[in-house]
Amino acid sequence: PDVQLNAVTGEQFIINDLFYSLMLESHNDSAVIIAENAAYYLLCKNPSLRSETPFINNYNYDSSFLSEINHEQSKILVHIFTDLMNEKADDILLADTYYITPNGLDDEDNYSFHHTTAYDLAKTMAYCINNEDFLYIIQTVSKTFSDTTGRYHYQLNNKNRLLNPDEGIISGKTGFTNKAGYCY
């Protein structure tokens, strides 16, 4: 399935809209854009981490230049972000989880593999549903948004067919990879 927002090079977004794109429709490019921005802001706060990113000229919390970085530069920022994901996994005591990419797709350049267990996934969801913003986004049925110029418009629909608060199902996350197939 096409699980991309299909953002245009140079396009800029409100980050919250990308959270909807990620959580409602599993847009892989949204996960990467979020990862690049989160890594950039981490670098702004932590000068000691900047040795990997000589392509960044300004750490003034203005991430607009990220819409113009190349694939190799993106991979560096994504790697910084996945390190953060793995640190968070350790923080919430996920004993059998390791992340390679922010979108869950395999990385053809990396010989390591994502892995987790049903138990760790349950612990992850238990952690996430304590965040009101997360719950609000994941329970949204549909959302429309545009890039910051208003030129491009996007319609999102929640792909989770199991979501039904009347039956006690308040949250969940769908997904797909070639190796795993469709997942809930």
Language-model segments: residues:
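Extracytoplasmic/periplasmic mature domains of Sec-exported, cell-envelope-associated bacterial proteins
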Residues: 1, 5, 26, 69, ...
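Signal peptide-directed extracytoplasmic domains
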Residues: 1-24
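Short, conserved acidic/polar surface loops in the N-terminal third of protein domains
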Residues: 3-4, 31-35, 46
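Structural recognition of the beta-strand scaffold that forms the well-ordered cores
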Residues: 14, 20-23, 30-33, 96-101, ...
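Glycine-rich phosphate-binding loop at the start of an alpha helix
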Residues: 16, 28, 115
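Short flexible coil/turn linkers enriched for glycine and charged/polar residues
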Residues: 25-26, 178
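A generic alpha-helix surface/boundary motif
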Residues: 28-29, 83
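Penicillin-recognizing serine hydrolase domain
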Residues: 36-184
